[in-house]
Structure formats: C-alpha cells, structure tokens
Amino acid sequence: KGENASTPIVAQKTFEVVPAITALHIVSAPQLVYKYYEAAGVTNPANAEFATNTAGLKVQATYLDGKTRDITLDKLTISNVPMKAGKQEVTVTAKNGVKTTFHVNVEKGNATFVTPSPAILGAEDCSVAWWGAHLDEDIKVPAGETRAFSFTNLSSGALNYNNFVVVLRNAAKVEYAVVRADNYGWGNGYAACTLGCTGGVDWKTWLSGMNGAKVNVYVTNNNNGTADVVAIMQGTDGKVNTQYYYGINTVDANDFYVDFTVDCSCLKFDSAASARKHYTRAHRR
C-alpha cells in the first residue's frame, strides 16, 4: 500500500555453479531392436528415421573439475536412428556440444502389399466422424508375416487424432489394440508395447502436413503372441515422420486381422503402382 515495512525483507537463494562438461560416457545403452519392412511395389522414403527409445540409457558426464557423475537425459540431445539394416550409431550431445555415441541394431523384414476395400475409406471432405467407416473385410495377417498398406491420408486438421486409425483384432472383431496416427492407442495388448515417434517433437508442424500425407503402414504378426505396427508418413511439407508400436501382446497368432477406421479423416488406398509413384516423386524433390 505504499508503506514502508516495519522490518527489512530479506530473501536469498543458493545456486550451484556447475563446471563445464568435458566428456560424456555411456554407462548402459538401450537394447531395443528396431524393425522396418519393405514390400514389392512400395517405396519407403530414403531419409526415414526411428525415434530413439531411451529405456535403459544411462549417461555420465565428466566436468572441468575432474568429477564424474550421472546426468539426466533431459539435459542431452539424442539423435534418431537411421532406418537402415545393421548396426546404427546414435549420437548423444550435451548443451555445450560435447558428444558421445552408442549403437543399436536395426532389422529389415519383408512384407506383402495389400490394397483393401473400399479403396476410399470415409468421405473425402473428412466429414465421417470417429469409427464411422471401416474396411469391407478385415485383412488377415498370417503367423510370421507382415502386411503393407499405402494410402493418402486426408485430415480435417482440427486435432492430432483426426487421421488414420489402425485396428488389430480377431475374426470375431474382438480388439487386441487400436493405434492412432499420433502415436497413441489402447486395448488389452497395447499397454505392453514399446512405442515411439519422430513427429511428437513438434505436433503442430506434424499435423499441418497430414492433410494429403503419403503413408505406409506395416502390420506384423510375430507368431509369438505379439504384433508390431510401423507407420511412415511423408507430409505435404515434405517432412518424413515415423512411429512404431513393438510388442503389442495378447495376440492369437492364428486369429489376427487388421482393419482401418477414420476420425474426421479419409484414407485413399493405393495400388502397388500408385504407392511406388508417391515416394518416387518424393525422392526427386
């Protein structure tokens, strides 16, 4: 109220001065094996990458004063994993530019391309609401095999989930899991899976490129009670984003099907020729 305090007000805070980092050391590296797929007639973008799963990653830093101690991952930048078969290098970088690396394994599998019916799922004006359109017939994925789907994704652009939706279920339409384009899902088998995506770094930019994005989705029946889903999206801005769901469980390997649905979105499925053309054009940009 403009009056002087009767006693002085004193405030203080203690700050810890942290010396500069001189070296980073990998104490333990993640053990996840990344998997991607190729199918005749379908081309994946050459610059596709996986988001690095950091489960199990522990890093220590050595500082200018010679002391070494644990450093939390939020103080580090971790590169993505190239979508290429073999041992791939991941770079860990401190804020002052000091780097170290570790390696992960990437495996390539083969898939069979499928064009489901109808060729256009949902209305092209994206007016069909959640769960309002499904395939005429679910696609069976036999034990130990992968099915590949390629389509143009149309979106209302209102929310992240207004895009393609993948439904994994049995012949009686009892769901194992449902996964969305924004790397989220649910179902009895979903909780156990390992998931990751590159688009989550900037959802706003990702969403702005999804109305007209070219998408490849690979669904794998691992023949061990689990299934995987990998999606590769090339937005209208040319940016490539990927997502994965590894180890969806509670799956009956002999009774496993995939369906697609929409949520204020539309999927225009490709033939093998049109799928190849989509990404060939992207490579020429």
Predicted regions mapped to residue ranges:
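Serine/threonine-rich, repeat-prone extracellular segments and beta-strand-based repeat modules
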Residues: K1-I9, F15, K67-N96, T100-F102
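Interdomain boundary/hinge segments at the C-termini of tandem beta-sandwich modules
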Residues: F15-P19, V104-K108
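Solvent-exposed, low-complexity, repeat-rich "mucin-like" stalks and linkers
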Residues: T22-K67
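Extracellular Ig-like/FN3 beta-sandwich strand-entry sites
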Residues: T54, A85-E89, G212
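Secretory/extracellular carbohydrate-interaction modules
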Residues: I120-L195
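Ligand-recognition surfaces built from glycine- and aromatic
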Residues: D125, W130, L135-E137, G144-T146, ...
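Short, aromatic/His-centered strand-loop micro-motif at the edge of beta-sheets
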Residues: T194-N216
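Short tryptophan-centered beta-strand motifs in secreted/extracellular beta-sheet-rich domains
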Residues: A213-N221, V229-A231
